[in-house]
């Protein structure tokens, strides 16, 4: 299975990483709904899971908009793939340690704040809700939570993981983070507490 995935990464890196991201965003939301919110299968919000998968990297049915799977590689998966390539090309400092720290700093000061805003904005648009209300309510708590977890994880990722596996590594680590993002996104829309 891993060899098949490696081949897919070489042959179709953007599509492979985007679909992987979509699946794992859906897993994170399902975990939020089932393990944290304890909704049960009958009360599972399938459209919410679909929105998370769509944002993560692709159109995973059921989703209210009928778009061809191969034409939709939504937001996070494609951007993260390109972002890691840019960091690899552009941030090369005199020592390996400085290079890793520089990449983590760029990731956490540029990409993370932007992507949290893009996530909350995307969810607001897909839900038909108030963008300003969602950003005001959830942006800062989500960003602070990000900064308590991701700098260390990205330090390990940039130091030890080869470029072609960095998005996969982030995706696996993202299962818990996506659970948090899903809860953060739904604060106020239901009685979902946001803990950061």
Curated annotation (Swiss-Prot):
It is a multi-pass membrane protein. Keywords: Membrane, Mitochondrion, Mitochondrion inner membrane, Transmembrane, Transmembrane helix. It comes from the Eukaryota. Pfam families: Mpv17_PMP22. It is found in: Mitochondrion inner membrane. The chain crosses the membrane at residues 67-87, 109-129, 145-165. GO terms for cellular component: cytoplasm; mitochondrial inner membrane; mitochondrion. Its main location: mitochondrion. InterPro entries: Mpv17_PMP22. PANTHER family: PEROXISOMAL MEMBRANE PROTEIN 2, PXMP2 MPV17 (PTHR11266), PROTEIN MPV17 (PTHR11266:SF17). May be involved in cellular response to stress. Required to maintain mitochondrial DNA (mtDNA) integrity and stability. Belongs to the peroxisomal membrane protein PXMP2/4 family. This is Protein sym1. It comes from Aspergillus fumigatus (strain ATCC MYA-4609 / CBS 101355 / FGSC A1100 / Af293).
């Amino acid at each position: 299975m891993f060899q098949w995935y490696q081949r897919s990464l070489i042959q179709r890196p953007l599509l492979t990483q985007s679909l992987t991201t979509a699946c794992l965003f859906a897993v994170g939301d399902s975990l939020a709904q089932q393990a944290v919110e304890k909704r049960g299968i009958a009360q599972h919000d399938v459209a919410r899971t679909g929105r998370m998968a769509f944002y993560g990297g692709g159109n995973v049915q059921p989703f209210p908009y009928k778009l061809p799977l191969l034409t939709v590689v939504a937001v996070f998966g494609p951007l993260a793939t390109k972002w890691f390539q840019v960091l690899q090309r552009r941030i090369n400092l005199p020592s390996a340690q400085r290079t890793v720290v520089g990449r983590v700093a760029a990731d956490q000061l540029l990409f993370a704040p932007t992507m949290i805003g893009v996530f909350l904005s995307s969810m607001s648009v897909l839900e038909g809700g108030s963008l300003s209300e969602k950003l005001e309510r959830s942006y800062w708590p989500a960003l602070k939570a990000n900064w308590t977890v991701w700098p260390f994880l990205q330090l390990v990722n940039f130091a030890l993981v080869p470029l072609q596996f960095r998005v996969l590594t982030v995706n696996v680590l993202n299962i818990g983070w996506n659970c948090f993002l899903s809860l953060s996104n739904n604060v106020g829309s239901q009685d979902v507490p946001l803990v950061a």
